[in-house]
A protein has these predicted regions:
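A cross-domain feature marking catalytic cores of carbohydrate-active enzymes
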Residues: 12-13, 55, 113, 139, ...
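Glycine-rich phosphate-binding loop signature in dinucleotide/nucleotide-binding domains
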Residues: 1-4, 130-131
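Short, conserved active-site loops that position catalytic residues or coordinate cofactors/metal ions
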Residues: 3-27, 138-142
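Active-site catalytic loop in hydrolytic enzyme cores
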Residues: 58-163, 222-233
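CN hydrolase (nitrilase-like) catalytic-core segments centered on the catalytic cysteine
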Residues: 32-52, 118-209
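Juxtadomain coupling helices with adjacent low-complexity linkers
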Residues: 216-221
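Short beta-strand scaffold segments in enzyme catalytic cores
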Residues: 53-55, 66-69, 100, 190-192, ...
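Hydrophobic residues at beta-strand termini and immediately following loops
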Residues: 80, 102, 179, 203, ...
Length: 235
């Protein structure tokens, strides 16, 4: 009570649910998606909050993983499709193309979806180089049989993923907000990382809830992203 969010970010494909061979989800339904988006847009307008919604959409008959960005008045700012698919996703989804920077008031932000933020750091740098103060990272990650079950963020014994989240912020001097569903034993959790790579907050593992974090956009200078000499040239 009393906490007031300016932007709410949901995990990857929160609507209708992340698809995988081991996770049955009802067949893609464009009508259902439109109704769900409309309901969430109405809630955004009612509460005057911007939304980054992990979802899916059809483009020219092909199904894409995407994030729908809603303005505070409930209007659609646009989509950021997942461009770099995980190798396991190729039979279920089609890759998107292009990247965008969005704005909510004075806050500029980008979106890198799951695999993109973990293994393609240039997706985060692209946004930071164009003025993004924060990159939202909706993802889906759940426990696999026999996998390590962490209790502390970025545990050295855990997989590389949460260490990568710290790097994405530090290497670009921007905030990085990684957002996952809460599930028992998941190797990653939702977290907010500061522009110097320090952890601001994280959700206890497996615990349902809403992680709320305050940020200071004056600290998100994008300094290190701007200093990157790119493209690299052969010597």
């Amino acid at each position: 009570p009393g906490e007031r969010a300016d932007v709410v970010c949901f995990p990857e494909c929160y609507i209708p649910g992340y698809r995988s061979p081991s996770r049955p989800v009802p067949p893609p339904d464009a009508g259902f998606l439109e109704r769900a988006w409309s309901a969430i847009a109405a809630a955004a307008r009612r509460h005057n909050v911007a939304v980054v919604l992990g979802t899916e959409r059809f483009v020219d008959g092909a199904l894409r993983l995407t994030a729908l960005v809603l303005n505070r008045d409930g209007t659609a700012a646009g989509f950021q499709d997942k461009v770099q698919l995980d190798p396991s996703e190729g039979s279920l989804y089609s890759p998107g193309s292009g990247r965008r920077v969005f704005q909510a008031g004075s806050l500029k932000f980008g979106v890198a979806i799951c695999h993109e933020g973990w293994r393609y750091p240039e997706t985060v740098r692209w946004a930071a180089q164009r003025g993004a103060h924060i990159v939202f990272h909706p993802h889906f990650h759940e426990a696999e049989p026999g996998s390590y079950r962490p209790t502390v963020f970025a545990d050295p014994a855990n997989s590389f993923h949460e260490k990568a989240a710290l790097c994405r912020a530090a290497e670009n001097t921007c905030y990085f907000a990684s957002v996952n569903c809460a599930s028992e034993g998941s190797p990653t959790t939702s977290a907010m990382v500061a522009p110097d790579g320090t952890l601001l907050a994280y959700q206890p593992y497996g615990q349902h809830g809403l992680l709320v974090a305050d940020i200071d956009i004056s600290k998100a200078t994008g300094l290190l992203a701007a200093r990157c000499r790119s493209p690299y040239e052969d010597s």
